[in-house]
Amino acid sequence: MKQDKVLQVCYEDQTVGTLAMTADHKVAFQYSDEWLETGFSINPFSLPLQKQVFVPVKDHFEGLFGVFEDSLPDHWGRLLLDRLLRAHKQNPDELTVLDRLAIVGTSGMGALTYHPEKNFPEEQSSADLDKLAEECQKILNTEYSDKLDELYLLGGTSGGARPKIMTTIDNEEWIIKFPAHVDGKDAGKMEYDYSCCAKACGIMMSETRLFPSEKCKGYFGTKRFDRRNCLKGKKKVHMLTTAAILELDFEQPSLDYHGLMKLTKIMTRNCDEDVENMFRRMCFNVFAHNRDDHSKNFTYLYEADEDKWHLSPAYDLTYSNTYYGEHTTSVDGNGRNPGRKELLAVGTGAGMKKTRCEEIIDEIEKKVKEMLEEYLLGK
């Protein structure tokens, strides 16, 4: 496979700018003149709308700025691509990050696209969900799967660690997850129950469903918030994870909810609704024992009509631990056993009224106990 050294980054029908590999294997970026006149900053922190060549300072993302790394698949998608390349007698270790972005092309998460695009599979078949789940397990257990091309097309550019596919249901774009080998077989039912509880707790969520299965209690699915139907057809929405905004290694604990609340205020220009929703997510994660609350699990969406950023719907909410036994994002400095005191400190520190914080804490603690008791008892 011929290596790419330069890529064009596009948004809808406009060229945002150019990515180019430097001699020291970092990927420089420069906005196009057209975008400087009519566009917006694709990362207000790292890439202000200025005429200059930007070069990453940090090395978390293989020489990329975080906003472009957000377009790349995480563990599952990367595993699929690497297996697919090997099946086609190609060495995945020879790919640069620009090659991987070119393979993502127009199919990545968010609104940014990369050109020239490298194409792989041409069409997807219609295997049922149980069959796809079986093929995912074969790959995770290092067995060969004869559905590599189909699985890559369905889910190879999605983020996250768990196997998943991206598909269209009733003209809407959805993500459907399958259990990983470390999950229980009913992980989908658990994540669905968590999503229902989160909605009851006033947390903004995309539509979720539990898709039927003959082999487990169902597969969890969620409507994509980076895709929307409009009068002109499908619209892609530009998105930024917190990891990308702050150029953080999401696999390392490096964030506190104080910082997340402050970031939400800055990104949304003090939108009270978004700030309160972030507070609700923190409370939910504490009471529902979601400790995998890393910096890629908090995202902001650019609303072009408003020329403004907003907090995205919540996602990846489920019972989870970390290998070090603490929240990935600490709560007022406490990652192991945060409680009411720390939650109040974060809320009031962000300018919320203490009485309002107490109301939300009580509301969410009660709802979580009512709706998620079966998952929390004895754990």
Where are these regions (language model features)?
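Phosphate/dinucleotide-binding and metal-coordinating scaffold of catalytic cores
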Residues: 1-295, 299-379
